[in-house]
UniProtKB/Swiss-Prot annotation:
Native organism: Azoarcus sp. (strain BH72)
Protein name (record): Enolase
Alphabetized UniProt keyword annotations: Cytoplasm, Glycolysis, Lyase, Magnesium, Metal-binding, Secreted
Coiled-coil spans in chain: none
Any Pfam family hit: Enolase_N
Segments passing through the bilayer: none
Cofactor notes: Binds a second Mg(2+) ion via substrate during catalysis.
Amino acid sequence: MSAIVDVIAREILDSRGNPTVEADVLLESGVMGRAAVPSGASTGSREAIELRDGDAARFLGKGVLRAVENVNTEISEAIIGLDAEEQAFIDRTLIDLDGTENKSRLGANATLAVSMAVARAAAEEAGLPLYRYFGGSGPMAMPVPMMNVINGGEHANNSLDIQECMIMPVSMGSFREALRCGAEIFHHLKKITDKKGYPTTVGDEGGFAPNVSGTEEALNLIQEAIAAAGYEPGRDVLLALDCAASEFYKDGKYELKGEGLSLTSEGFTDYLATLADKFPIVSIEDGMAEGDWAGWKHLTDRLGRKIQLVGDDLFVTNTKILEQGIDQGVANSILIKINQIGTLSETFAAVEMAKRAGYTAVISHRSGETEDSTIADIAVGLNAMQIKTGSLSRSDRIAKYNQLLRIEEDLGNTVVYPGKRAFYNLRSR
């Protein structure tokens, strides 16, 4: 038995300079697990609640001392003496202790920090790398990265309505080569945007935020950078979008202010279909607002056979909502954000449900990140085959990529890089 003997939480800073929760879990053997939780800017209304202090005198109300106190008192008292290897039981203890549907009493930032730290401690105690602790001894695949190279929407101060324009290297034989491809494209994109007179400052997730005229110009810049780096768009590198459509859905219309467009659900589907015809787009995240289920159904019926349609705000890593989507034939993929649900066990259940239904599961960071690299181990351990963890700058993003490099090295020739096979939910790829 790997008994928990102490649980300690503290307030640290995330990549945006906002407070977040870090937790240490100590076992009787002397082993310790440490984990820190992320925070989002564009959030779904049904996400688990991160507990903030609301004290305007500290961090503009964004302090997390209440969540820290909850870990150091109630949560600590509830799990000290439990076996760290019993992840599901510990997570259920946290859920029951909170007692709310959305973890609003203790805070999902409190429960998740502890859930992750328990897993790290248990893996260390077992002498296993975290990805093996999550996934067992079977064959594993490296994830294809979604690299957010141009930021818009809530992640940047520009006129681009679409929140993320991403590249996905798919023709390479290894994750290492895919990462090199992405980095080379990123550096060429910097040169191209600079030459065109755009600023090369970066957004929350490390991508550039040029004040482009619209989505097509952004994608053309990316395609130019892909070619300049010596790769072929559509063969070596595919494109992906995160619309974050809930952010510009107003009174039943999709208001793309940067492009001067006001579109119905059908009109926005046409807009996305046109982009997919012009560019090698393989994935569109949150292509409709979270509450526009009729729009989602229309989008899925129209594009779901050839485009990965990822539900983020739509599903918020919640199995109850995902089950509704599967039953109604809405989307064909789920974005997995550990802090949307608040425990690892619930996160893993969402991945399992998606796979059983033939949906893909994309493991994702948040716009407010830390140096914690747990999601890299989750992506490999659960054989998710896709990861979304930002651009090729900012150490909070690079921490995940570097961990994936270490994992690939550790696995050697037993691991595969799936490339286009990662899109097992599509029939025409």
